Amino acid sequence: MKKLLSVLLAFFMVFALVGCSNNEDDNNGGTTGTEDGYKVAVVTDVGQLNDGGFNQGTYEGAVAFAEKNGLSYKYYQPANGSDATDDDRIAAMRQAVEGGAEIVVTPGFLQAAALETVAKENPEVKFVFVDGWALGLDNVTAISYHEEESGFFAGYAAVMDGYTKLGGTFGGAGTNAACNRFAYGYVQGMQAAAAELDTTVEATISFLYGGSFSASTELQTQISGWYTNGTEVVFACGGSMLQSVKAAAAETENGKIIGVDTDQSAESDRVITSAFKNLSGSVDLTLTKWLEGKWDAELADQLSNLGVGDEATGLPTAEGSWRFNSFTVDQYHEVFAKVADGSIKIDSDCADLS
């Protein structure tokens, strides 16, 4: 008999609770600017620049582009960290423009209102909205990803590798479309593998402590409880939230982690894989098109929605990053090809969970 994924009651409890209803002056960095200022700027999302994930992956793409083209670059962090307001983001973006930026990369959906304000003020400056959407402005281009694909691969691979009790903690408190797609794909991947293996898998999914994408003692306590109650691997989807999951896993003998956004294998030997999206590559490509004079023809007021066909989603397969016991890279390539050619269809139509 075909077995289906069993999602624990905690999944629905979390949805009912959450889904249904000292800044420092010198917080910026980069290369030495010229008399004309910094050409390429990144205004970070909530959390730290070196978060091993979303901010860092975006910034690394901008750095790679700038360095290979001999351009100066700088990053700007909005005041108040994870509690940054739209006014804080506007101030950081204005600072980037005043510093001479000709193009500003703004990762994160929370940037939308500030980005629209500053882009309207500065029509001569170009803006790249990562994890965003078209804003109806010719000087803004947006990049989004099929996160459900990466989530699917992570859930599928974990179950195929023998894990039967999985968890996932997701940022955005149910309002972040990217995190929602990661979660939706993760559950679909687990379910597909459970059906293929004719087994039952239990999953506990939470958006409870991810509103600010930050590490917290509350999140660490929650994940510690999951591991204590038998959860074998937890998908840590939300910037610095990974640090809480790492701390909880370190208290266990065998607790494993799935990372997100970038290859997070270097963060901990407990990370068995990462639901990857090619942030650095897609940012680099977009900036290259701008430099080549293709903005008006290919980027102005456009949304680039990237996935397996663009090699923008998936799992990292480098030797040190692949830490499954029995599920092989060849098996992964087989299921990747089936998603790419449409043999396996992954639903992306998940509602806002707020």
Q: What is the predicted function of each stretch?
A:
Residues C20-N22, N27-S354:
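A residue-level marker of the well-folded mature domains of exported/periplasmic proteins
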Residues K2-N22:
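Sec-dependent N-terminal signal peptides of Gram-positive bacterial secreted proteins and lipoproteins
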